[in-house]
């Protein structure tokens, strides 16, 4: 019998830390991009409103309609980027969890252990030699050491 603290490994592993840092970085870039576009849209809106009296009613309505479609496109792009980012990271997290499960299996086979329980589901264990957590964490870190994360938005690396 073996015991492993899956959550602890995910929390402490270098790969998950890198993934979290990258997620925050990409999220920040998306937010900075939307803020920049919002500033430009506010300027464009003020320009349209300031010219209201100088334009014909039809021209004003056309400019307003065009402006609203630009706002819609910016909002749509933001939602798409967020969705892509979230889906990418969920996919990466799943792959890392699957790899971690394989590492646990490899360690248990190497130590001739037939059953491994999650530490959170075990009430008490007195023999700490059955705790595979640190060994699994070390091996998981080694297997993910050369991992790189790149996300592409609209065919451009982020």
Region spans (language model):
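Amphipathic, charged alpha-helical segments and their helix-to-coil junctions
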Residues: 1-158
